[in-house]
């Protein structure tokens, strides 16, 4: 018994296949999905979705969205996503370092659009870096 997983972004189908286990980055924490899971609708945070097929794990960097689990079908609708194997880890680490520097520079300051954008860029860079290493 396995799950059917679909990860869909507005411009592409990122993943469409079978999985034995899926770990979702929900806004309330990690949610593990196995065959027979109860129906679920969850908001997703920027983070890494992990997919296990047999003993192999794949990672997908997600930039927020929603997941629906219904009768062993998992549908993930996201703003954008990237397979970990398609992310250059050196470039992702460089982007993460630059984003971390930008956030650190703005620490202690009141919330401004610039600070919010820097924090969002940091979250995205961290998700991409984690997904690039998890493959």
From Swiss-Prot:
SUPFAM superfamilies, alphabetized: Epsilon subunit of F1F0-ATP synthase N-terminal domain (SSF51344)
Localization per Swiss-Prot or TrEMBL: Cellular thylakoid membrane
Entry keyword set: ATP synthesis, CF(1), Hydrogen ion transport, Ion transport, Membrane, Thylakoid, Transport
Mode of membrane association: Peripheral membrane protein
Family statement drawn from the similarity comment of this UniProt entry: Belongs to the ATPase epsilon chain family.
Subunit composition and interactions: F-type ATPases have 2 components, CF(1) - the catalytic core - and CF(0) - the membrane proton channel. CF(1) has five subunits: alpha(3), beta(3), gamma(1), delta(1), epsilon(1). CF(0) has three main subunits: a, b and c.
Function according to Swiss-Prot or TrEMBL: Produces ATP from ADP in the presence of a proton gradient across the membrane.
Protein name per the record: ATP synthase epsilon chain
Species the sequence originates in: Synechococcus sp. (strain CC9311)
